[in-house]
Amino acid sequence: MTYTPLEREDGTELSVRMKTITKLIYLAFTVVILAIGAVIANGAPGDLFVSINGDGNNGGGFIYEYNPGGVQSTFAAGLSRPRGVAFDHFGNLFVVTNTFDSVSQTLQVTIVKITPGGVQSTFATLSGNLKGQGVAFDGAGNLFVVANDLNDPNLTSTIYKFTPGGVQSTFGSVPGQGFGLAFDRAGNLFVTINHAVDPSELWKFAPDGTSSVFATNPDTVSAWGDLAFDRFGNLFNSTDSATPTADKILKFTPDGEESDFATGFTEPRGLAFNRGGNLFVANRSFEPPGEILKFTPNGVETVFASGIDGPQFLAVQLLPTPRLTR
């Protein structure tokens, strides 16, 4: 009988081949671990990223990164009036920026993509005299951005949709200043809308683009800001009345029941939850400088970071979805 190498009775060839296979498996596993590590190298799970207006000039803005202990570092610089921030499934951070064109006297919106290593590139630009605000990803990895029309006294806004490949389309529009965006688990998109005279509104867009009014602000003075969902499907909304310490964080149940979650803010803006269910709030509070507040699920408040010049929107780096990185 003739034996193939794998069938030798003494097992010698089998042992050699098994060692080779084991090495290959180990190498493949190492490559996967290194790939995941590369994705989160400069954005460890749980780190908080904050867009900073800075001096308000072109290139004067930043993205600050805070580890869970509140230690600050600068993740990106040279950004123009950065606003909404959001992570994709691969750990890339997308930032809405607004650059003033001194020739045309208009504001130009650019969506900047920043890799985990801090490399910046232009993902997309919007044409027109617009101001970009909130940004959010749906479950399929499509990016949504709301931008205000500065040529319209009502600041009517358009919600733009970008595929992962950067193909742009118009998802919907709202009759006022769109600000915060957030998706629920069912794929519905929520957007806050502020009006010059009428009360602020919270609109809900179904995945097919059908819109409805989810809630209306009973306070005609305050404007509604950013949005964030907790793990139970409750929606949180920052408010701004332009009166020091008079602002709130509102909580909406999935059925639309509204309550005050926290009060005593001065111009709160960005909201974000971490995996532990803690809510982070960017409180601009100009004098003294802004701060990031942290609320436990039961509402206990602490100052997470302070002395911040114009904090805007927030995003928490979560563990990337296991996919091929890009």
Predicted regions and their residues:
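N-terminal secretory signal peptides that target proteins for export/translocation
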Residues: M1-T22
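Bacterial N-terminal signal peptides
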Residues: Y26-G37
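Boundary/junction segments of secreted and surface-exposed precursor proteins
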Residues: A41-I52, T321-R326
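Beta-rich, blade/repeat-based domains predominating
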Residues: A44-P45, N58-G60, G78-F90, L126-A140, ...
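Conserved beta-propeller blade signature
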Residues: D47-S51, N92-V95, N142-V145, N188-V191, ...
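Short loop/turn segments immediately following the C-termini of beta-strands
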Residues: N53-D55, N98-F100, N148-L150, N194-A196, ...
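A short loop-to-beta-strand structural motif that recurs across blades of beta-propeller domains
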Residues: G61-Y64, Q108-V112, S157-Y160, S200-W203, ...
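A short beta-strand motif characteristic of beta-propeller blades
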Residues: V71-A77, V119-L126, V167-S173, T210-N217, ...
